[in-house]
Swiss-Prot record:
Listed InterPro entries: Bombinin (IPR007962)
Tissue distribution of the protein: Expressed by the skin glands.
Lineage: Eukaryota, Metazoa, Chordata, Craniata, Vertebrata
Keywords of the record: Amidation, Amphibian defense peptide, Antibiotic, Antimicrobial, Cleavage on pair of basic residues, Repeat, Secreted, Signal
Pfam families: Bombinin
Cytoplasm among keywords: no
Record function comment: Has antimicrobial activity, but no hemolytic activity. Preference on killing Gram-negative non-enteric bacteria.
Modified residues (Asparagine amide): N70, N133
Record family assignment: Belongs to the bombinin family.
GO biological process, one term: defense response to bacterium
The protein, known as: Bombinin-like peptides 1
Domain of life: Eukaryota
Amino acid sequence: MNFKYIVAVSILIASAYARSEENDIQSLSQRDVLEEESLREIRGIGASILSAGKSALKGLAKGLAEHFANGKRTAEDHEVMKRLEAAIQSLSQRDVLEEESLREIRGIGASILSAGKSALKGLAKGLAEHFANGKRTAEEHEVMKRLEAVMRDLDSLDYPEEASEMETRSFNQEEIANLYTKKEKRILGPILGLVSNALGGLLG
């Protein structure tokens, strides 16, 4: 009987965590949409300015190179050309740095998601071990089936790019974001239902 209360408390904690995750996902999804729109506008403006600046510098460098090709360069002319070439190279490297920053941000997000999945898998594994050591009622068997389904869904999130590569290849970024939000809600839905049913059975 005491163990039932321990399991019930564990399930209550999991339920609260799942509800919190669902609320956080909804809030973050809305915030992400707004932030993504703002970032797209900022990147678009910045990219236009940067592209115009690079084009102007390249045009200037090309013009000077053609001019110097028809005559001898002074030491000062040579220094000017070196600085122009360095400026163009620096602007090209900035594009690479922006891509590296995006990879770092994605890595941090993946780590947070992995930690949440590990916590839920640990709870599911503990309940599975408990039920494996004794006879299961029909209700407990149903609980375990749902737990196993949830764990399979969590495992499928470990390789989202492989699982949905063909499905999302032609989607734009906003459609991809909506797809992953729906998938997370589809996984959290069974968790909430599972917790409610298990709690009702244990305390009933």
